[in-house]
């Protein structure tokens, strides 16, 4: 989705002038005891690039001057759960009885809204809820870092992904002007993700939905916007309503497993079956898929991922994440059906 730059940038420049005026009188929280030196060459170039794109450079600099470098964010980047936990540990963390019950309560509370979202965006409620459940425990843990601090720290003090986070920082500055968000108080994760569904700024700008036609897209507290935006993201990345995410697989002693090395759907169901792997699915043999293996406390779990599995990895490019979303979604669906039964 291409932004309408001339009109947006005029609006953002005005918004930034107002925000920076207010920010000059505000007291930023003292978390690290220092601020970024805007004369650093990479920061100066960043501000120059914003100015060249039409943004008010002085207003952007006034906002960035309030950002504080947070070294602990760099530490957090090196140990995400997807890289430090085995599958069985990761799954157990997200599929507690308490989390499932919290999801069922939220489903009951917003059943009509979730049904409307499913009808419009063609994404089943359990998957929308599962993403919010894994990301923030259904809105309970949306992050305790200022987004400005997190993005600036990663943009200028984390060389491995500096280019990506500088882009996200620019997107955040644009977003705060468009949505009238105070850049000094917006809170999020250590990576700068925001709201109950943890959208990065670029995703917020391009995929967030104003479900109730209010004045802004609010992913922190407006459940209509949260559910609709999550479903919109999945739908625009190719979600297919009614199709499975995963299927269980078993193999014979002579089977050739050939586990997938990437997230691409480089196999077909027929080819996997031809190698001696039994897949519990009624999908046709020409269905694109990938064969997955994940360690349990004892032994291995084998599954086949389909199109909707791949779509979930567009939200977070981790196999463990996509499997956890599937399993939590199924647990929510089973629990709400069981509790509805006479």
Show which residues each predicted segment covers.
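A contiguous strand-loop segment
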Residues: 37-42, 49-66, 162, 166-187, ...
């Amino acid at each position: 989705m291409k932004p309408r730059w001339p009109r947006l940038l005029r609006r953002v420049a005005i918004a930034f002038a107002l925000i920076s005026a207010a920010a000059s009188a505000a007291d930023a929280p003292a978390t690290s005891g220092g601020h970024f030196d805007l004369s650093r060459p990479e920061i100066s170039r960043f501000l120059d690039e914003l100015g060249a794109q039409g943004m008010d450079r002085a207003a952007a600099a006034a906002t960035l001057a309030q950002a504080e470098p947070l070294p602990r964010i760099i530490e957090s980047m090196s140990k995400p759960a997807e890289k430090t936990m085995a599958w069985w540990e990761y799954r157990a963390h997200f599929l507690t009885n308490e989390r499932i019950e919290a999801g069922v309560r939220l489903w009951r509370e917003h059943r009509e809204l979730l049904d409307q979202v499913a009808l419009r965006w063609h994404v089943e409620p359990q998957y929308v809820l599962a993403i919010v459940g894994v990301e923030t425990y259904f809105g309970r843990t949306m992050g305790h870092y200022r987004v400005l601090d997190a993005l600036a720290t990663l943009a200028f003090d984390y060389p491995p992904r500096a280019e990506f986070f500088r882009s996200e920082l620019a997107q955040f500055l644009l977003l705060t002007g468009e949505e009238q968000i105070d850049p000094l108080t917006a809170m999020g994760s250590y990576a700068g993700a925001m709201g109950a569904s943890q959208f990065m700024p670029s995703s917020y700008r391009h995929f967030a939905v104003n479900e109730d036609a209010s004045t802004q897209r609010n992913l922190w507290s407006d459940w209509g916007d949260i559910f609709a935006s999550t479903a919109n993201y999945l739908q625009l990345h190719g979600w297919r309503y009614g199709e499975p995410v995963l299927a269980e697989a078993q193999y014979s002693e002579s089977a050739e497993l050939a586990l997938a090395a990437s997230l691409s759907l480089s196999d077909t169901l027929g080819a996997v079956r031809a190698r001696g792997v039994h897949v519990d699915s009624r999908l046709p043999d020409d269905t694109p898929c990938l064969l997955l293996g994940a360690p349990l406390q004892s032994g291995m779990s084998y599954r086949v991922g389909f199109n909707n599995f791949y779509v979930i990895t567009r939200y977070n490019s981790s196999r463990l994440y996509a499997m956890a979303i599937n399993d939590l979604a199924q647990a929510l669906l089973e629990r709400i059906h069981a509790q509805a039964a006479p």
